[in-house]
């Protein structure tokens, strides 16, 4: 084992974490400048491993923590890692090995802490010390670690100090501790023996005094014995008399009880009847309350609503009938007016039809006369123009040129007229198509307004609206009925909820408040945590049904177990219990089914074999199979018997519980429990049954209420749907009516467009006629010019032309006359036609349209709709009348039911009053029996008290000897016995100062004397053993010192010869009474234990006085000198030799030397270095030095650097180490 690694942090000058790794298991040398921190490194190791830094004060701990610039350091720690492949260190319990042959010891110190850690586990310093001792590192050896100054101190040590060092190595302190403890115990033994001797003297004196008291006590006891005999005889006679009187009273009591049984049975029957009548009366009152509060009010409200509805229907029927009559009258009036207007229109149209042919004829004649006149005028103009134009020309060519130009113009004009005609023809064709399209659109619009599809659609809408309104009325009636039903159910639910709460209170009264709160909170927690009902089943009492005959048995056996909550698993129970604990919600007991098992050992005996009639209670309990374990767990070992005595036998024999129908029970241990049970007092099972029934009814009504509310939601949805459908159909109907109005507007627009088209067509026709006329004129003029080209040139008109000109004048005049006559006739006819058209278009036709529109709006569909509405209202009236009849009947029925309930209530109250009166009479009779029984019981109680007093007095007399009961004093009366007893009491009173504890005290003190004698003997034996132990301890100390000194002396001589080959040295131990000059002889120590033992047990005698050193450095034969006579370097050699000799006696696995060669001469430094090299083969050495001698033989080298007041350690090689020593120390080689 050796030190492998040292980690220092915050310790003295080592501020930062400093890791010194890779120590050699042999020799290691640490170098560094003065003040760099070498000694602090050794102090760090001593801080962990030695006692030098134990029990540190706050100031001392603060001195170990680095104090420097920069951030403050709050703690210091040193960690030493040992390489222990042989596992020589035995780790304390609880500390695990790392598995890498390393053991880590760490000590951390702060201002308020001082902790040790071993392999990262907190341990005590004692654990560290014991572990190091197992590895050979002893705290008794002060030279495993040799700091600076230790060599100098040993060099200048006195003989006594060297002896103390030798004793420390031996472990003499432990001998001294044991020796002091033995001497202390020896002294305590002497004190105890003196005290015992003193007590023995006092006891002997006391015993002599007690002998006289003992004799007086014997006389007193004899008198007391006779007195007890007399007392016993008197008490026994009186006790027999008391017992005889009690037996007579018991007979009277039994007779009285037997006589009252008939009345008690009758009282039980009356109790049952009163209970039944009370329950029935409560039920009647609840029903009557519901009838009055709900049924009657709803019936009245319904009758009132239906009456009001019937009145509203009658009013609506009257209104609709009036609308039908008014619309029919107006329709007849409008029809007559329309017929008259149509007749007038027809007359005007017939008149127009008669005038129009003449108008057309005159129009054609006028056009023809105009054309003729225009033609004649054009010819006249042409001839006149020809006369004037031709006069301008001088030759034919000039004329012809002009004519050709005119011909070209006329041809161009004719062509334009032809083109215009084609365009006008096309326009006329387009207008005619538009006219036809407008005619078709007008027909379609008329069909859309008055066609059968539209009328049928409106009729369908009206029919559907009637159906939907009827459906809506039915739904509203249904909703009202559901509302009434809901109100009734809510009233019933409130009543049932009150019953549930009352039954819950009744159940709670049978248990503790904490348990009641717990059961209520369990249900809340189950709902809150959403635990399945298949996991929490309820209380055991709710899960079973018991025959009424055996209900008392189940009640007594079940007890509080009836309120235990049955769950599926313990996980469920734990979950609920944790929540109960969190909310402080009471206490409950759970029965997890998965933790129960059926007891196969339960075997009921056969009725035939036992000849005792019994019934297993479990057979009278009904439950679901899944709860079998829980039910059998509580009731499975119980049998019901008629007689408790026989049941007790069965219970003991078969390890069962037996119970009677009255509730008296016996368990398998023979314990009997019983007494009076009030059969009419509400029991737990009955309360649980009533609670379950009320909850069941409440749940049923709640489900019905939920069903009604769901139906209400459905009917509300249905009503919304019907209202939606009504709105949709109404909107569709309004949409159709709106479309009809749009169609009418479009029809008027189309009619106006038709008139405009007619006017446009007439204008085009006039244009075409005018165009034909112009084209005819142009063609004639063209023909004239072409004809003129063929004539000879003449500037004057020809004779024919002149005659034609004159003829034309006459023809024009005649044409004018004809045109004027025709125009005048046409104008008169046109005026008449315009007047007729204006009357038709402006007056008659609009009136016709208005009346037709009005009659269309208020047409057959509207009338039919009103008629349908009237039929619907009449049907509704019939339905409402039937509803009214039913409502009246229902109101009468409810009133009759209420009257019946009131009558039944009155009868039951009378019956209850009668039963109560009879009950009072029975109770009075029983009260008389009770008073008689009480008097008997009072007498019996007095006698029982007297009997107990007599029995107590007899017991106080105690046991009497058998010879005392031989004489029964039958020939002596009680008075005589009493006189003898008084005389004896007088004699006893004379001995009232006798010590009644004399026998006991004498015996006690005698035993005390024997005990003291035994203790004195034991103390003598203990004293002898302690004296033997003291002798042995002294002898062991002397032997240990002698043995260790011999070893150290031999090692010292050998080591000194290695260091100083030419010299010699030896150790001399001095014993008391030795002559001071006898230093030249080695002493052979022989201690005589007997002669050195002090008489008072104190170790005041010192065997040895010191250890001195005798040496010679030049010759083995020269006179040797004492160490005080040597030089400083020679003293250091002796000190080192002594340290190494001590270490060889108690070898350790590692050693630390801090500059042990500082004061040595050159030759001795080399010898020490060589010796350490040899010793390092079996142990690890870590040394500091300022010389090069150790560097020549060491294995590892480390340098301590000091910068910015902070120490660090680095590893260097041999050359770097030697170079540093030579460079920093000019005496390195000296």
UniProtKB/Swiss-Prot annotation:
User: What are the recorded Gene Ontology BP terms?
Assistant: cell division; establishment of meiotic sister chromatid cohesion; establishment of mitotic sister chromatid cohesion; G2/M transition of mitotic cell cycle; meiotic sister chromatid cohesion; mitotic sister chromatid cohesion; reciprocal meiotic recombination; replication-born double-strand break repair via sister chromatid exchange
Q: Which GO terms describe its cellular component?
A: meiotic cohesin complex; mitotic cohesin complex; nucleus
Its main localization is nucleus
- Chain positions found as N6-acetyllysine: 112-113
GO molecular function, a single term? ATP binding
Please state every residue range assigned to the domain named SMC hinge: 535-651
Where along this sequence does the record place binding of ATP? 32-39
Q: List the Gene3D superfamilies.
A: 1.20.1060.20, 3.30.70.1620, P-loop containing nucleotide triphosphate hydrolases
Q: Which SMART domains match?
A: SMC_hinge
Which superkingdom does the taxonomy of this entry point to? Eukaryota
User: Where found?
Assistant: Nucleus; Chromosome
Q: Where is the secretion signal located?
A: none
Q: Pfam families annotated for this entry?
A: SMC_hinge (PF06470), SMC_N (PF02463)
Quick one: where's region Disordered? Answer: 1078-1097
What are the entry keywords? Acetylation, ATP-binding, Cell cycle, Cell division, Chromosome, Coiled coil, Mitosis, Nucleotide-binding, Nucleus
Write out the similarity annotation. Belongs to the SMC family. SMC3 subfamily.
Q: How does it assemble?
A: Cohesin complexes are composed of the SMC1 and SMC3 heterodimer attached via their SMC hinge domain, MCD1/SCC1 which link them, and IRR1/SCC3, which interacts with MCD1. The cohesin complex also interacts with SCC2, which is required for its association with chromosomes.
Q: What information about domains appears in the record's comments?
A: The flexible SMC hinge domain, which separates the large intramolecular coiled coil regions, allows the heterotypic interaction with the corresponding domain of SMC1, forming a V-shaped heterodimer. The two heads of the heterodimer are then connected by different ends of the cleavable MCD1 protein, forming a ring structure.
What exactly does this protein do? Involved in chromosome cohesion during cell cycle and in DNA repair. Central component of cohesin complex. The cohesin complex is required for the cohesion of sister chromatids after DNA replication. The cohesin complex apparently forms a large proteinaceous ring within which sister chromatids can be trapped. At anaphase, the complex is cleaved and dissociates from chromatin, allowing sister chromatids to segregate.
Q: What is this protein called?
A: Structural maintenance of chromosomes protein 3
Which organism does this sequence originate in? Saccharomyces cerevisiae (strain ATCC 204508 / S288c)
What lineage is this protein's organism placed in? Eukaryota, Fungi, Dikarya, Ascomycota, Saccharomycotina
